């Protein structure tokens, strides 16, 4: 009885391992919002305070007319009004992030109010999490509109990262269409964070701009390309010197060249590479998992259920026409069998075995009474014969050997 209670007791901490990104992303967005606030205030302070001092000195010394002083003050007032508008927008964004965080904390806190896995509240909570995982997978796969509709229908818009993934997919799509403007604007907004990134997204984007200039084979564009390289590629000389030398070599090779690496640099597949690189960089900066959460959850669940029998040489009972048994193993199902093929096996420290096991000549083990009862129900089977429920093979009862478990 105690063992049964232990097995059904809900461990909230283990469940929350999968849901860390649920709180990590709002925290990261709040941090970036604060950084933007500090940066805007610092920039305006560096302009307004010196300008105010200069205007005061000029007014007191008589070097400026009252009209000039008023014009200077009008400029400063205009900038401060602009600062106020920006700060109000950032404040609204902060309120939205805090509201989202509060909803997510409330959702996760519900787990601590559920004592058992058999509680109906746990089933309801799990359904909400499943909806979140499905929406996350849809957003990462580019089905943004469908994901938004599902989130609205389930009333869980605060629990999923719709805006973040929609923006990510929009920029990734623009790169696949051969445009770098949106991606470079995103890099400019996240310049400080990109310095710590393991990826060189901005360099690759600037390199692609250079390649497109060279592709035209126009002499005027060649000059523009060299100016572009000195301005945007040269600063990366210490870390990307090999790539910069290859870029210089493009001047001597036309777009239809077969010589590597120039052929690959001209290839249209580079746009796909840039799109994927942007997604990896975007997820790294926002502390998002590189894989969909559904894949992670499925991998853990499939591995926990997988046994060597699931991928044995014999076909599973769910797909075997000779089988007299119906498999309830999810791994043996046609939908999940291939997905689980490369996952590790479950670590079973205890086994549940029939109390009268026998082994058939083909090496498969069954309970004797269950095997005999099943064989008697088959009218086509001769007396003294037994049939393997999984493979359909027929053997003599005398060929059965008792199994002893030490």
From Swiss-Prot:
Gene Ontology BP terms: negative regulation of gluconeogenesis; proteasome-mediated ubiquitin-dependent protein catabolic process
Zinc finger annotations (RING-Gid-type) as residue ranges: 329-391
Residue ranges of domain CTLH in the record: 164-221
Nucleotide-binding keyword on record: no
LisH domain segment(s): 126-158
Subcellular location: Cytoplasm; Nucleus
Record PROSITE patterns: CTLH, LISH, ZF_RING_GID
Coiled coil regions in record: none
GO cellular component, one term: nucleus
Transmembrane domains' residue ranges: none
One Gene Ontology term of the molecular function aspect: ubiquitin protein ligase activity
Keyword hit for Metal-binding: yes
Alphabetical list of InterPro entries matching this protein: CRA_dom, CTLH/CRA, CTLH_C, Fyv10_fam, LisH, ZF_RING_GID
Keywords: Cytoplasm, Metal-binding, Nucleus, Zinc, Zinc-finger
Membership in a protein family: Belongs to the FYV10 family.
Its job: Involved in the proteasome-dependent degradation of fructose-1,6-bisphosphatase.
Protein name per the record: Protein fyv10
